[in-house]
């Protein structure tokens, strides 16, 4: 299986399956001398670990990080950093009845068609459990971006059809200090109601995550095929639940006039930001704004039609332990992927300028 590595200079490879012994990441290209501890990575992992919140999977993984290499006396050495997270609460027996059945909305069918076999235990490599390794790697990337003054923040824009009032809503760490990472408290209350309804109905919900990048310098990004927006979108789309990414005004530009979509400049800087902080694939120094559409969790207890490996029809109701919605656990995953892309471009920029 290829496609497990992202990055050119700051390179991250993740490995492991949902019900294997462990998952983890190897980071190559991290500069030496950065202060790095297990506590720093653990703080990021604790934001996405399972078993936290009323609507999260009851799978109780501690997600304790272990740094195996690349750090000496609390500082990165410049050699590959190996990160390990042991799986301690896998309940593989809950998936025995799914060995020969394809779950709707999952990668079961496509993995089987590609490889001729699949790990039916929680989705194997296709499981959202893999994203814990991304979050761990993103915490390391955040050290690189923080040194450049960059701050990445993701938050809930919409959940189950309830959207925040973006006009006048302040997005900062203080306003997001709630279980749904939602800056609009009234919207968060209604979102919680939708989650309760979906859980009681044996169903799940999707949502939209917003991402803002502040303090990003102008000049990052590589034309033509390695444009900043192309790499950010690709990194975010690599998250299993993500089905769409908008940058800046996104799809709304299709209904605009050029006079509306162009961002005028003045001696003091840009007067608008429909571009979302990126022009011609290169950052312009303005805030990078993104929106990420996340599909509902496909594992639901409601009856669904599917087939088995022989093509026979099956009616399936999925047991096991599952979230009602990927939000808010997906939020640190989105932040991590953006951090990894930005760290890579920061280091690449050092190779093209004196």
From Swiss-Prot:
UniProt keyword list: Amino-acid biosynthesis, Aromatic amino acid biosynthesis, FAD, Flavoprotein, FMN, Lyase, NADP
Catalysed reactions, as listed in the record: 5-O-(1-carboxyvinyl)-3-phosphoshikimate = chorismate + phosphate
This protein's pathway: Metabolic intermediate biosynthesis; chorismate biosynthesis; chorismate from D-erythrose 4-phosphate and phosphoenolpyruvate: step 7/7
Binding site for NADP(+): 48
Catalytic EC class: lyase
A Gene Ontology cellular-component term: cytosol
Enzyme Commission code(s) on record: 4.2.3.5
Manner of cofactor binding, per the entry note: Reduced FMN (FMNH(2)).
Keyword Lipid biosynthesis: no
GO biological process: amino acid biosynthetic process; aromatic amino acid family biosynthetic process; chorismate biosynthetic process
Binding-site residues, FMN: 125-127, 280, 295-299, 321
GO molecular function: chorismate synthase activity; FMN binding
Gene3D superfamilies: Chorismate synthase AroC (3.60.150.10)
InterPro entries (UniProt xref): Chorismate_synth (IPR000453), Chorismate_synth_AroC_sf (IPR035904), Chorismate_synthase_CS (IPR020541)
Needed co-factor(s): FMNH2
Function (record text): This reaction introduces a second double bond into the aromatic ring system.
Alphabetical list of PANTHER family matching this protein: CHORISMATE SYNTHASE (PTHR21085:SF0)
Similarity section: Belongs to the chorismate synthase family.
Quaternary structure (record): Homotetramer.
Name of the protein this chain belongs to: Chorismate synthase
Protein's gene: aroC
């Amino acid at each position: 299986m290829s496609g497990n590595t992202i990055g050119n200079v700051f390179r991250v490879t993740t490995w492991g399956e949902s019900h294997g012994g462990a998952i983890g990441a190897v980071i190559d290209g991290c500069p030496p001398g950065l202060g790095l501890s297990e506590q720093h990575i653990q703080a990021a992992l604790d934001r996405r670990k399972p078993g936290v919140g009323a609507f999260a999977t009851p799978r109780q993984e501690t997600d304790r990080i272990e740094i195996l290499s690349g750090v000496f006396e609390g500082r990165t050495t410049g050699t590959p950093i190996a990160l390990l997270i042991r799986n301690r609460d896998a309940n593989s027996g809950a998936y025995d009845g799914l060995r020969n059945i394809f779950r709707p909305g999952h990668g079961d069918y496509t993995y089987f068609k590609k490889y001729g076999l699949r790990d039916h235990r929680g989705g194997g490599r296709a499981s959202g459990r893999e994203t814990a390794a991304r979050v761990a790697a993103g915490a390391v990337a955040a050290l690189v971006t923080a040194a450049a003054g960059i701050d990445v923040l993701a938050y809930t824009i919409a959940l189950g059809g309830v959207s925040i009032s973006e006009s006048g809503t302040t997005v900062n760490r203080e306003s997001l200090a709630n279980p749904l990472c939602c800056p609009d408290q009234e919207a968060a209350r209604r979102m919680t109601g939708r989650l309760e309804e979906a859980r009681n109905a044996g169903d799940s919900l999707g949502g939209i995550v917003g991402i803002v990048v502040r303090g990003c310098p102008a000049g990052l990004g590589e034309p033509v095929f390695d444009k900043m927006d192309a790499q950010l979108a690709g990194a975010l789309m690599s998250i299993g639940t993500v089905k769409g990414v908008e940058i800046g005004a996104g799809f709304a530009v299709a209904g605009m006039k050029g006079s509306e979509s162009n961002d005028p400049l003045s001696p003091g800087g840009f007067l608008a930001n429909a571009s979302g902080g990126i022009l011609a694939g290169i950052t312009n120094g303005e805030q990078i704004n993104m929106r990420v559409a996340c599909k509902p969790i496909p594992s639901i207890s409601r009856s669904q039609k599917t087939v088995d490996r022989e093509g026979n029809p099956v009616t399936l109701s999925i047991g096991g332990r599952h979230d009602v919605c990927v939000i808010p656990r997906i939020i640190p995953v989105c932040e991590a992927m953006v951090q990894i892309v930005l760290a890579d471009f920061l280091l690449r920029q050092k190779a093209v300028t004196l």
